[in-house]
Amino acid sequence: MGDVVADALEKLSADQIEQFRKYFNMFDKEGKGYIRATQVGQILRTMGQAFEERDLKQLIKEFDADGSGEIEFEEFAAMVANFVVNNENDEGLEEELREAFRLYDKEGNGYINVSDLRDILRALDDNVSEEELDEMIAEIDADGSGTVDFDEFMEMMSGE
């Protein structure tokens, strides 16, 4: 088992591994111990996991290095972990950012003004210059409204 697979499996709980095994077995009907690489997307959809087709293709390429098209359970679990663990982390990050946003959105009107944003950015990095702050704020508040809504805030904080 490669390092990439071992590292990914370490991040999974016993419950997650058991769940992945059930889905894997649903598609490995003959008990061969592997599934076709082309089935991974179907399984992710069955699990209700969102994914980008290009990300999936890249992972399959990474885990099916010999190009055989056969994915064993450990490889499958490691691949799926990339989607499940990342999605859970994204949800946690979004909730944390939403909470931080609410702290600065004192009136509860769905936006914060750029002076509050300046305070947030300065708190995150006290070495940032006024010029750098101006540049960051201009980029974040692209429409020049003087306010930042949650989506703009989320994009800035998560880099997405």
From Swiss-Prot:
Keywords: Calcium, Metal-binding, Repeat. One of its GO terms (cellular component) is centrosome. It comes from the Eukaryota. SMART domains: EFh. GO terms for molecular function: calcium ion binding; troponin I binding. PROSITE patterns: EF_HAND_1, EF_HAND_2. Pharyngeal muscle. Ca(2+) 1 binds at residues 64, 66, 68, 70, 75. This protein binds two calcium ions. This is Troponin C, isoform 2. The lineage of its organism: Eukaryota, Metazoa, Ecdysozoa, Nematoda, Chromadorea. The gene is tnc-2.
